[in-house]
């Protein structure tokens, strides 16, 4: 049997269901390239030393190490930060296991999407979609964040922007994410990602971070650390507006 288990976005988010699945497993695998993971908590729960899987292990080799464990009739778990099913690589492993006739269970965890909207007090019903702010590849910037934010602002919807992760596991800090958006504005030039654009930054959830509300220019000059996500708010209801004013006031006292 294979269990895909989410540990939540940081320390203190492990559910009872997640803990039980890990304790009962013969083989415990984890990856930390899609989201940060509380490895020490994982070690306390596992019966043996957890095995770290790389992006290549999961995506290029289709989780071969996991299936070697399953072939021996053992219980395997793949543990991730956040929720296990928000990454396409994890969904691919689940689908492959089912095709090969193995029982599969999913143990949900607190996702960064839910955490971001909880901490910002914005309505998740107005989420218009998710895009990733990526580092340029070969000098080319992805315009997907620009296009999605532009569409959502026209429709009165909020946009969640995930921030990139380098191959070495380094999470893009908010300052670099803001700089990428400003560079996109220089290239696209439709007046969207200006320095005065208001943005919510949710950073280091479960690792001593919180949420701040500031302008894109202020974020580009900040020293906030990753991992982080941005929310570009659109039309605000009265409660949303009051919540963001509170975040802005708290941010100004830092």
UniProtKB/Swiss-Prot annotation:
Keywords: Methyltransferase, S-adenosyl-L-methionine, Transferase. It comes from the Archaea. CDD domains: DHP5_DphB (cd11647). Its EC number is 2.1.1.98. It catalyses: 2-[(3S)-amino-3-carboxypropyl]-L-histidyl-[translation elongation factor 2] + 3 S-adenosyl-L-methionine = diphthine-[translation elongation factor 2] + 3 S-adenosyl-L-homocysteine + 3 H(+). S-adenosyl-L-methionine-dependent methyltransferase that catalyzes the trimethylation of the amino group of the modified target histidine residue in translation elongation factor 2 (EF-2), to form an intermediate called diphthine. The three successive methylation reactions represent the second step of diphthamide biosynthesis. Belongs to the diphthine synthase family. HAMAP family: Diphthine_synth (MF_01084). This is Diphthine synthase. It comes from Pyrobaculum aerophilum (strain ATCC 51768 / DSM 7523 / JCM 9630 / CIP 104966 / NBRC 100827 / IM2). The lineage of its organism: Archaea, Thermoproteota, Thermoprotei, Thermoproteales, Thermoproteaceae.
């Amino acid at each position: 049997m294979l269990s895909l288990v989410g540990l939540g976005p940081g320390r203190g988010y492990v559910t009872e269901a997640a803990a039980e699945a890990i304790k009962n497993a013969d083989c415990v695998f984890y990856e930390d390239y899609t989201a940060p993971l509380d490895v020490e908590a994982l070690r306390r729960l596992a019966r043996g030393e957890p095995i770290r899987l790389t992006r290549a292990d999961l995506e290029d080799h289709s989780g071969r190490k996991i299936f070697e464990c399953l072939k021996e009739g053992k219980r395997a778990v793949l543990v991730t930060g956040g929720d296990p099913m928000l990454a396409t690589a994890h969904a691919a492993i689940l689908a492959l296991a089912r095709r090969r006739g193995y029982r599969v269970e999913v143990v949900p965890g607190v996702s960064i999407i839910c955490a971001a909207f909880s901490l910002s007090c914005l309505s998740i019903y107005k989420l218009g979609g998710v895009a990733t702010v990526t580092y340029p590849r070969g000098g080319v910037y992805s315009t997907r964040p620009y296009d999605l934010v532009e569409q959502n602002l026209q429709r009165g919807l909020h946009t969640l922007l995930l921030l990139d992760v380098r191959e070495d596991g380094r999470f893009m800090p908010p300052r670099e994410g803001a700089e990428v958006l400003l560079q996109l504005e220089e290239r696209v030039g439709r007046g969207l990602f200006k320095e005065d654009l208001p943005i919510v930054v949710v950073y280091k959830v479960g690792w001593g971070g919180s949420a701040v509300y500031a302008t894109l220019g202020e974020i580009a000059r900040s020293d906030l650390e990753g991992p982080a996500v941005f929310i570009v708010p659109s039309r605000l209801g009265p409660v949303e507006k009051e919540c963001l004013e509170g975040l802005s006031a708290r941010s100004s006292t830092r």
